[in-house]
């Protein structure tokens, strides 16, 4: 059985990472693809778990060797998604989440046309500013850069299949789970999962 690919995008500070973390903790057969990046690790981040941290030279080499499904430069740092890793997980029947920006999402959609695209929005710019400031991961200069680009990022929601407003964490999480569950009940997924059962059911009907 082949897994489904879920692309989740949001402006920085929207709460995407926290939602995905909780979703993974409560959902079976679901994983998140670990991206490659040239940015410095933040406090508490582990190489190979949160990101594959690398330098610019190695990243550029990987691009030249077509190792990435998508790659982009964001605020002076490079980010990319390994195609080999994603395909291996999908082929193993695992549903895969890509946490990437809208540019990368559109790149991946051209390759995986069945990918399910989800955009998460904050309830307001004021809330977004507060969240970016409260988490204490970036300087005020970086926060202002992120806010300046946020409007353009959020305008891309129109290219996605689903939109979630993260005003209430538990509500947003429930809505995110609902998308995963609904996909797993589609005809295509159920035929893959229960092919033998369905064949036996129809065979019994014919025999009678």
UniProtKB/Swiss-Prot annotation:
Q: Where does ATP bind?
A: 10-17
Looking at the record's lineage, which domain of life comes first?
A: Bacteria
Q: Where does the Guanylate kinase-like domain start and stop, copy by copy?
A: 3-181
Per the record, its GO cellular-component terms are: cytosol
Broad enzyme group: transferase
Please list the GO terms describing molecular function. ATP binding; guanylate kinase activity
- Where is this protein localized, as stated in its record? Cytoplasm
EC number assigned by the record:
2.7.4.8
What the entry lists under SUPFAM superfamilies is as follows: P-loop containing nucleoside triphosphate hydrolases
| Keywords (A to Z) from UniProt | ATP-binding, Cytoplasm, Kinase, Nucleotide-binding, Transferase
List, alphabetically, the InterPro entries matched: GK/Ca_channel_bsu, Guanylate_kin-like_dom, Guanylate_kinase, Guanylate_kinase_CS, P-loop_NTPase
| PANTHER family the record matches | GUANYLATE KINASE, GUANYLATE KINASE-RELATED
Q: Which HAMAP family match?
A: Guanylate_kinase (MF_00328)
Query: Main role?
Result: Essential for recycling GMP and indirectly, cGMP.
User: Which protein is depicted?
Assistant: Guanylate kinase
């Amino acid at each position: 059985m082949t897994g489904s690919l879920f692309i989740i995008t949001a402006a920085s500070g929207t709460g995407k990472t926290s939602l995905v973390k909780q979703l993974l903790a409560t959902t079976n057969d679901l994983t998140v693809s670990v991206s490659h990046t040239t940015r410095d690790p933040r406090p508490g981040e582990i190489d190979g778990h949160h990101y594959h941290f690398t330098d610019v030279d190695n990243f550029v080499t990987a691009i030249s060797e077509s190792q990435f499904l998508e790659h982009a430069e964001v605020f002076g740092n490079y980010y990319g998604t390994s195609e080999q890793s994603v395909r291996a997980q999908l082929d193993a029947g695992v549903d895969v989440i890509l946490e990437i920006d809208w540019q990368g999402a559109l790149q991946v959609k051209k390759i995986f046309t069945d990918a399910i695209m989800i955009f998460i929005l904050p309830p307001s710019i004021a809330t977004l500013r507060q969240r970016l400031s409260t988490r204490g991961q970036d300087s005020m200069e970086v926060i202002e850069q992120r806010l300046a680009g946020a409007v353009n990022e959020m305008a891309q929601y129109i290219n996605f299949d689903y939109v979630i407003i993260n005003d209430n964490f538990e509500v947003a999480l429930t809505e995110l789970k609902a998308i995963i569950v609904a996909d797993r009940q589609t005809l295509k997924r159920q035929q893959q999962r229960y092919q033998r059962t369905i064949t036996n059911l129809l065979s019994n009907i014919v025999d009678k």
